[in-house]
Structures are given as C-alpha cells and as structure tokens.
C-alpha cells in the first residue's frame, strides 16, 4: 500500500535518516536492517500463518524508539509485550489488542497496557467513550494494495467519513496522546480529526512520499 502511495521502501539507513530529519517519518523495512529476517521471509510466506517472527519483529526496532504504539493479535500477548518494551527502554507507550486485531479497533472493547516511565497500567479501552461508533469487521475491510491506497487518500482528503476514518482517528489519537505532553486520549482523537480535516495529514503523506523518492535518487 505504501508503494502505491508513492513511498520508496528500499532505502538505506542513511537515506532513511535524511527522510526522518526532513519529514519526521520513515519506514524501516525489517529485511534491510536484520538480515536474518530476509533469510526466513520465504519460509514465513510459504507457511501462511503466524510465527514467532510476528512477535519478534516489532520488538527489533532498529530506531530504538522510546515511545511506541504496538499492536498484538492476541490479548494474551498484551502484558508480556508491554513488559518487554519497558525493559527495552520504552518510557511512554501502549500495547493494544482490539478484538483480535493488532491495532485499536472499533469492533469492540480493546485490551491495552499503557507504559509510563516503568509503570505498566492494563485496562480496557471502549471507543464509544470517546464519541466513536462501534462497527463490524466488514465495515473495516479493505482490498488490494491499490484499493487500500485509494481508501487512505479518501480518508485523508475528507471524502471518507465512515468507520474506516474513525478507526484511523482512534489509532492516530492514541499515538498523539502518547507522543504529546499534556494531552488526554480524547484530546488526541480530536487533534487527529483536526489534522485530517485541515489537510495537514494528506500534505504530510505527500511530502513523505516525495522525500523518499528524492532520497532514492540521491
């Protein structure tokens, strides 16, 4: 999907560093940083099911970010992953499982564990408590990479006002809540809506894509 949006994924660490400095965003393709991931990729693809690498991948972030929002596919992983992130130096973060999805979800309640300076706080997050509506899996379903790229652009351009937009508001709102001092989660969701409605989010996406293209040519 990112490639359909114009993002170049196969950048070197030095190229990604320039993109990050310019835009505040970069995509770190695991196989480019952890050679073992490249070796096992064909096996993982052939198996067609989750493996230990679905758990290890998010924990091997080469950026060593101290703030992270991490989704897991099973509720039983929420607390262990939060503990590992804290042990790895994450001082502000959240691990979330949304009704079997590895992200915050509008399908139902979300089991989360918030990380703040070594303290782990588990709780359930109900989207309806933040003005968001519950939905079905079908309402969130995407399609091909090309179709998903168009859905993304429609949301960021304000043409999509349904469940998919609210799913983005929830997840982006959590990230803003974690990353900006003094915000409540409700503030984060409101801020996410403002950034989309103002066109700032779409402009950032376009600038990010352009920056990766420029870096690839340099």
Per-range role (PLM):
Residues 3-10, 15-218:
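Glycine-rich anion-binding loops and their surrounding alpha/beta cores
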């Amino acid at each position: 999907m990112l490639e359909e949006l114009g993002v170049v994924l196969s950048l070197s660490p030095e190229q990604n560093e320039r993109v990050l400095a310019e835009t505040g965003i970069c995509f770190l393709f695991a196989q480019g940083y952890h050679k073992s991931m490249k070796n096992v990729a064909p096996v993982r693809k052939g198996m067609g099911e989750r493996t230990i690498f679905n758990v290890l991948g998010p924990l091997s972030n080469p950026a060593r970010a101290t703030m992270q929002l991490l989704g897991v596919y099973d509720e039983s992983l929420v607390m262990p992953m939060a503990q590992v992130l804290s042990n790895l130096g994450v001082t502000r973060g959240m691990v979330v499982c949304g009704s079997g999805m590895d992200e915050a979800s509008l399908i139902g309640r979300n089991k989360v564990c918030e990380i703040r300076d070594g303290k782990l706080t588990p709780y359930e997050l109900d989207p309806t408590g933040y003005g968001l509506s519950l939905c079905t899996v079908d309402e969130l379903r995407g399609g091909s990479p090309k179709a998903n790229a168009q859905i993304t652009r429609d949301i960021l351009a304000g043409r999509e006002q349904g469940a998919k937009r609210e799913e983005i508001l929830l997840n982006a709102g959590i990230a803003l809540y974690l990353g900006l001092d003094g915000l409540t989660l409700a503030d984060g969701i409101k801020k996410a809506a403002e950034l989309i409605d103002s066109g700032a989010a779409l402009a950032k996406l376009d600038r990010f894509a352009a920056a990766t293209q420029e870096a690839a040519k340099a």
